Swiss-Prot record:
Classification via Gene3D superfamilies: alpha/beta hydrolase
Active site as annotated: 153
Pfam families, A to Z: Esterase_PHB
GO molecular function: acetylxylan esterase activity
Stated name of the protein: Probable acetylxylan esterase A
Signal peptide: 1-19
GO cellular component: extracellular region
Transmembrane segments: none
Involved pathway(s): Glycan degradation; xylan degradation
Assembly and oligomerization: Monomer.
Gene Ontology biological process: cellulose catabolic process; xylan catabolic process
Organism for this UniProt entry: Aspergillus terreus (strain NIH 2624 / FGSC A1156)
Amino acid sequence: MAPFSFILTVLLYALTCSARALGHAHALLPRAGSLEQVTDFGDNPTNVGMYIYVPNNLASSPGIVVAIHYSPEGTGTAEAYYTGSPYAQLAEQYGFIVIYPQSPYEGTCWDVSSQETLTHNGGGNSNSIANMVTWAISKYNADSSKVFVTGSSSGAMMTHQNVMAATYPELFAAATVYSGVPAGCFYSSSNQQDGWNSTCAQGQVITTPENWANVAKGMYPGYNGTRPKMQIYHGSVDTTLLPQNYYETCKQWAGVFGYNYDSPQQVQDNTPQSNYATTTWGDDLQGIFATGVGHTVPIRGDDDMAWFGFA
């Protein structure tokens, strides 16, 4: 029989190795309660930055909110969206994780124009963001049925043009879109990344719900699964992305979901607040038009939580 001292030494060594391994595993995860950068989330074809907020009050099988920043004059960054939006505070209340992607381009707008980003697994910005989501689901045992996406301005365009219903519909359950344009509206025939499309921005790309739906569906050919429900905000005096884009975006998702755009179920004036009008086509589509509001419509965090099903 082995001496007791030898057995004790072996046990202590095993416990020490286990503790070190556990500590190393925890060290690989970002700290809770602060904005942290993640650099090893997987394939990142366009060098998009990943920042994450893990709440101190993390749920056992948490949801995920992807919050995509705006782009004006270089001020739109992951950190700016973290400090200027309510999602980190709401994460502490509801226990979900927030992913804040960071655009890789000078001026910090997103690529919503190239063929790569407008194609499922095409190697664009959208591909990188999708990989952030799958990484977070795996690392935190997140609930894959509770993954949501939101964004403002260029982030709104990335939200519904690329990452969400059009390009990665299988990843997301719902979205809120603040002051964006229809999916594919900024498409560049020269395949320019991070390209600006003045015709679209000025609200001059006008077509039918069926045509818009075909544009969105064409970004993931052959996909027949569920798509995230959409809540679309736009201001009546938006001079950056003119208000016609609101109507075209609503047309698009009415077409995608099979609703009759010209016959919504309900129109509610002064909802959710004075001078806002909410149009509901069905369970999967709402539009909120904000009279007197410019670019962008202010984030309504509590309403987002209700749309996502947290509240």
